[in-house]
Regions:
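Conserved, single-site charged/polar hotspot
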Residues: 1-150
Length: 150
């Protein structure tokens, strides 16, 4: 689902973060080990079953060889993967492939998918874009105000 607060609703736009090493990532994990963490046998596939308007998965379906399924949030999956030693940066999985007991996941992104992209903001600043414009790109509709002083 999308956020009802306009400045936090996410943006579907090109970003200079595409040059970052975390823009696209690949990780491998034992299908059996992952299955054990989520109450399945050997996990053979992971597919998005629910997405927000910007195609970022909000629910992922894990399926084992017997056809049993478990739905999890991207955050839960990232936590399960991290517990197994994976370096997956986000739950935004673009592709999963199972071969000889190993589940290979290809994904995108690093953060939570809402608000300011740190890598993109840094790249824009290096290109001379001012902080006000960077904030406006990241948080459309937000107003900058001073809330301290005399």
């Amino acid at each position: 689902t999308s956020n009802a607060v306009a400045p936090l609703s996410g943006q579907g736009r090109p970003c200079p973060c595409q040059k970052s090493g975390r823009y696209r990532w690949t990780t491998k994990v034992s299908g059996k080990s992952l299955g054990g963490r989520v109450g399945l046998q050997t996990v053979r596939s992971i597919k998005p079953v629910q997405s927000n308007p910007w195609a970022r998965a909000t629910k992922l379906r894990l399926q084992d060889a017997q056809g049993s399924v478990v739905d999890v949030s991207p955050e839960k999956l990232r936590n399960h993967l991290a517990a197994l030693g994976s370096k997956a940066f986000s739950g935004w999985i673009l592709k999963s492939q199972y071969q000889q007991g190993v589940l290979t996941l290809e994904g995108a992104g690093f953060g939570h998918g809402v608000g300011m992209c740190q890598y993109g903001s840094e790249a824009r600043a290096r290109d001379g874009v001012g902080w006000r414009e960077i904030l406006a790109l990241s948080y459309p509709g937000a107003k900058i105000a001073t809330n301290w002083g005399p």
